[in-house]
Curated annotation (Swiss-Prot):
Organism classification: Viruses, Riboviria, Orthornavirae, Pisuviricota, Pisoniviricetes
Protein name: Membrane protein
Cited InterPro entries: M_CoV, M_HCoV-like
Predominant localisation class: virion
Cellular component GO terms held in the UniProt record: host cell Golgi membrane; membrane; viral envelope; virion membrane
GO MF annotation: an example: structural constituent of virion
Gene this chain is encoded by: M
Membrane-side (Virion surface) residue stretches: 1-20, 73-80
Length: 223
């Protein structure tokens, strides 16, 4: 490959570049760090969505850089490593889409393409299905109602609900299985507040039950 087409930088030019762009790079890295550190669904859904976009862009950016390194490798050793890294990045990116599509088939929610987790908590509240990502594989889930505001695992889902509106079952959908949680405890603190604890009771390869009466017969279809 003709090296004359490649830009050549001296150490002085590199230092000058860092001096000119140091502030901008620092601000960008600080912004990304804050988003990644504090982007949780229990804090701010808007910040969490920005975090998901940043994480989602990481893989295509990585693939682009590894392909670039293949074309402009310094020597054969760097070329070999670049090819391996490119293959690994593309394979992982494809697996991400395969798993996300499988989870989307199971839940029908766009949260299935969340790059952070493959666990989606699903709860049917008065005929409305709420789907939210959860990071860990919990053995118990806690639903809290505070003056009509509904929270599941600290994530606010909506308002205008009471403890009597809580379902008997809550599910967590994964790529391979659907975990069912059964309500095991309910405590009413006052008229509009209380909490319930759901315990994992069953795991199977099912689709998410439909919230529509006409779709209840498809609740146990294989995904």
């Amino acid at each position: 490959m003709n090296k004359s087409f490649l830009p050549q930088f001296t150490s002085d030019q590199a230092v000058t570049f860092l001096k000119e762009w140091n502030f901008s790079l620092g601000v960008i890295l600080l912004f990304i760090t804050i988003i990644l550190q504090f982007g949780y669904t229990s804090r701010s859904m808007f910040v969490y969505l920005i975090k998901m976009i940043i994480l989602w862009l990481m893989w295509p950016l990585t693939i682009t850089l590894t392909i670039f390194n293949c074309f402009y490798a310094l020597n054969n050793a760097f070329l070999a490593f670049s090819i391996v890294f490119t293959i690994i990045s593309i394979v992982i990116w494809i697996l991400y889409f395969v798993n996300s599509i499988r989870l989307f088939i199971r839940t029908g929610s766009w949260w299935s393409f969340n790059p952070e987790t493959n666990n989606l908590m699903c709860i049917d509240m008065k005929g409305k299905m709420f789907v939210r990502p959860v990071i860990e594989d919990y053995h118990t889930l806690t639903a809290t109602v505070i003056r009509g505001h509904l929270y599941i695992q600290g994530v606010k889902l909506g308002t205008g609900y009471t403890l009597s509106d809580l379902p008997v079952y809550v599910t967590v959908a994964k790529v391979q299985v659907l975990c069912t949680y059964k309500r095991a405890f309910l405590d009413k603190l006052d008229v509009n507040s209380g909490f319930a604890v759901f315990v994992k009771s069953k795991v199977g390869n099912y689709r998410l039950p439909s919230s529509k009466p006409s779709g209840m017969d498809t609740a146990l279809l294989r995904a």
